[in-house]
Amino acid sequence: MARIPGRPDYDALIKLLLVGDSGVGKSCLLLRFTDDMFTSSFITTIGIDFKIKKVDVDGKLVKLQIWDTAGQERFRTITSAYYRGAQGIILVYDITDEASFNNVRNWMRNIEQHASDNVNKILVGNKLDLAEDKRVVSIARGQALADEFGFRFYETSAKDNVHVEEAFIAVAKDVLARMEGEHANQQLLQQQQLSAAQPVRLTSGSPSPAQGKSCCR
């Protein structure tokens, strides 16, 4: 169906945030998803970077604005402001790096402190292509942590393009479903408020209180 001129060329705009330790592959995941490219010579993100991609989510055209945050401690104050506007958060660790997995709890504390209470989140264990020789975090441990927090869980490889799109689409679906539910609830509330505000009118045939039967005999 043709879009009306002057209106957005998408059905929904969703802001996603990639967080996790430096070096876990957040920028590589973003580049693979948005541009279907991979490079092993990424320079560590300085501050904030973002890309945009439009995707089909359950028949709706969704514009994803995906923000890639720096993982180093000295940039935490910069990235904290971006939590507040995020509708979905992808929390990434490196399956070959125990410290990055342990730090997931620290990132969760940041999310709980700065992000909206209803923000959708998923957990991603990246660098699956190195699993055979260098894995130190098992699938079971990753899944157990995701279950503890109530997250979806994916293991991905930006290099081999494994489960990358599925992870981004999954969080986008969760956000879209929540947004639609909130919109429906808001419409219902407005209808209820409108109904409550309508005055009650008596028809001409309705007896007034004075015309009722007297309790006196």
UniProtKB/Swiss-Prot annotation:
Biological processes, Gene Ontology terms: protein transport
SUPFAM superfamilies in UniProt: P-loop containing nucleoside triphosphate hydrolases
Lipid attachment residues per UniProt (S-geranylgeranyl cysteine): 215-216
Region described as Disordered: 198-217
Membrane topology designation: Lipid-anchor
Subcellular location as annotated: Cell membrane
GO annotation, cellular component aspect: plasma membrane
Motif placement: Effector region: 42-50
Sorted UniProt keywords: Cell membrane, GTP-binding, Lipoprotein, Membrane, Nucleotide-binding, Prenylation, Protein transport, Transport
Pfam name, any one: Ras
MF-aspect GO terms: GTP binding; GTPase activity
Major location (coarse): membrane
Matching NCBIfam families: small_GTP
Role: Protein transport. Probably involved in vesicular traffic.
Annotated protein name in UniProt: GTP-binding protein yptV2
